[in-house]
Amino acid sequence: MNSPAPLESDAGIEAPSATAAPTGRSALLAGIHGMVVATSVGQVLPVLMTTLTSELHLTVTQAGFLAAADVGATTIAGAAFARPAGRFALSTVARVGTVIVLGANLACLLVTAFGALFALRLLAGVGAGIVTVACVIALSQNKSPARAFALAAFVQMAFGAALNVAIPFLNAHYGWSACFVVIAAFAAPGLWIARYYVRSQAPQAAASRATFTIAGWMAFAALSIAFCAIGATWANLGGLGERSHLTVAMISIAVSGASIAGPVATALTALVGNRVSSLLGLGFGSVTMLAGVTLLGFAGSSPLFYAGSVVFMFGWAVYVPYALGLTSVIDPTGALSVIATAGANGGFSLGPLIAVPAIAEWGVGAVPYLAFALIACALGLIVPLQHTKA
């Protein structure tokens, strides 16, 4: 049987076939709900870890292990289940992950010992990773993936902000485990919502596609490298401010400005994401981040530091949805998007470590130069994709 000719999208990268209809609004909303569930702990990690440290009398090291268990397990499970999940219905994958998230979070009501809590947070992370697989695949198969990921990011930030504000109240009135109960309550509708997860290809067809073509490797490497730069810059933003002789209050103003710029950029991307190609959006985000780290590198006063922080965050927020949108075009099954998300998380974690030798040799002022080189390298990997077939 002859298959239909491939459609062309994003300057030459092969798009899904005409028989693979994009998912609709219900699948979009289901994917957004899944993304919020999967990232809920990460959104409130600093406040949550502080609460656990004070209420359960944990050490800072123990709190760090809990954070690593939760977020690390989500990243590893997402990457590990990306390909195997292609053999099952997407709704089944979503339900399995949701059940694990529900059980692990509710079980936190029954424990106080560090070992038991560590095991439950590890299990919750695995569940969140499985949910991530389902929701990223659902979002990547939307007719405008960049716009879908931007909408999901905006809702994630809104939910995280609300929960961060609520945690002190919940802790004061209902105890330290109340936050996990809220997360479980928000996740519970996922058992019903899972019916709206739609895969644009049959499970076996999705599982059989080659995720890592040359274009897939290049996109994965570019996203991972870019997030090394992002992680290194963000982790050392305070040090760069001190290098510019700014006070803690001034640095806080810059961080607040950047925190506002992120949602603004995400909202704008959600509005225009369907009108701009992934490659063009990636290019704009990359160039904007390059401008931001350049300003931070030359910042000798507060105005330049403020501008650099805001511009960098704006570019970062634009870059992410378009990067995931590009992986969706390269691999319509969504598996590459899941693995690329894990690569981005890994790069963000490795970035501060990569910056350590440069800081030891040349001081914190070397970070913007390192970030510039990494972002430029990532951009160099993206540019050839306009001539590449997936």
Locations of the language-model features?
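Extracytoplasmic gate region of multi-pass secondary transporters
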Residues: 45-46, 216-256
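Conserved MFS/SLC helix-loop-helix module at the cytosolic interface between two early adjacent transmembrane helices
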Residues: 76-113
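Helix-to-loop junctions at the C-terminal end of transmembrane segments
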Residues: 77-90, 265-278, 359
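Paired small-residue
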Residues: 104, 115-124, 303-311
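Cytoplasmic helix-loop-helix junction between adjacent transmembrane helices
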Residues: 120-154
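Helix-loop-helix hairpin linking two adjacent transmembrane segments in secondary transporters
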Residues: 142, 151-199
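C-terminal transmembrane helical hairpin of 12-TM major facilitator-type secondary transporters
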Residues: 277-323
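A late C-terminal transmembrane helix in Major Facilitator Superfamily
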Residues: 330-365, 371
